[in-house]
Regions:
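Conserved Rossmann-fold NAD(P)-dependent oxidoreductase catalytic core, especially the SDR/UDP-sugar
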Residues: 1-45, 65
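A structural motif corresponding to the C-terminal end of an alpha-helix
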Residues: 2-11, 49-63, 227
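Conserved beta-loop-beta element that borders a ligand/cofactor-binding pocket
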Residues: 16-17, 52-81
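Short-chain dehydrogenase/reductase
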Residues: 31-32, 39-51, 71, 80-85, ...
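Glycine/proline-rich active-site loop of Rossmann-fold NAD(P)-dependent oxidoreductases
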Residues: 60, 72-90, 120, 128-140, ...
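Conserved loop-to-helix N-cap of the C-terminal "lid" that shapes the substrate pocket in Rossmann-like
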Residues: 66, 110-123, 139, 150
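A conserved pocket-lining segment of Rossmann-fold NAD(P)-dependent short-chain dehydrogenase/reductase
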Residues: 89-117
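Mid/C-terminal beta-alpha module of Rossmann-like enzyme folds, strongest
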Residues: 123-208, 212, 220-222, 226, ...
Length: 253
């Protein structure tokens, strides 16, 4: 309503959705999830957003596209839903306490298939869908393009922190970390970190939710590849690179 009257040369509207479209928050869902899979009950706000935009575009000279990423990770502070930053802080605190690196989530999920997308790759996909005719008026799944299991990448995270790996130990992370603010303040001083309070960096309750399911999470990228998208990033290498960026920017030691 606000844009159309003033943007007389409007060409494209980009909608950012997510795998919640498929009901990931409801429990087990069909995998690999395809863009044309039946919607779950109940409908969620992603469905309402796309339906509204699609109807609004009908007969207009501009186009729309929607991306459905899953697990968007990238360098940031103050993000309430940044899983890797939370894991990085958990690892750093465990090391400060002289503990091995233990998987803190559901033991079943430790071996499940998982996926995510680097935020830099997501930005590239947004540009691609906005400027590619074959992508106009379509919704696409988007991830790094590969899959992994936490049990396979966990040793790489241990190597990054120079920590031994111990058996998984499911915990309520938020309950265990709620009293670590003073410890983090000391770490900031000792290691010369950016002067952020722990609660400014990580939302432990989000980690509780994200790491405590027991389902494969997998999206089909067939549709976007057939439309011409070609980029695939190695998720294990991306994890190490993002951890290093947190260290380089003095967020973690």
């Amino acid at each position: 309503d606000a844009v159309e009257p003033v943007a007389t040369e409007l060409q494209h509207v980009q909608l950012m959705l997510g795998a919640k479209w498929y009901g990931t928050y409801l429990g087990s869902y069909k995998t690999p999830a395809r863009e044309d899979d039946p919607r779950p009950l109940p409908k969620n706000f992603y469905h309402a957003q796309q339906d509204w935009l699609e109807a609004r575009q009908s007969g207009k000279p501009w186009s729309w596209s929607a991306l459905r990423p899953h697990g968007v990770w990238g360098f940031s502070t103050g993000s309430a839903m940044n899983l890797l930053t939370g894991i990085a802080c958990y690892g750093a605190i465990s090391k400060e306490l002289g503990l091995p690196l233990r998987w803190p989530g559901n033991t079943g999920f430790f071996g499940r298939l998982y996926q995510f997308i680097d935020v830099d790759l997501l930005a590239r996909a947004m540009m691609w869908t906005a400027t590619t005719p074959a992508a106009a008026n379509n919704a696409f799944n988007i991830t790094n393009g590969d899959l992994f299991r936490w049990q396979d990448v966990w040793p790489r995270i241990g190597d990054f922190f120079d920590m031994p790996i111990a058996d998984p130990q499911p915990i309520a992370i938020s309950a265990q970390m709620d009293d670590k603010s003073a410890l983090w303040e000391g770490m900031v001083e000792r290691h010369g970190l950016q002067p952020y309070a722990l609660e400014q960096i990580v939302n432990w309750r989000y980690l509780d939710m994200a790491l405590n399911n027991d389902i494969d999470q997998m999206s089909s990228l067939t549709k976007i590849f057939q439309a011409g998208w070609t980029e695939v990033w190695d998720s294990e290498a991306t994890i190490t690179r993002q951890l290093q960026k947190l260290r380089d920017n003095k967020i973690i030691p």
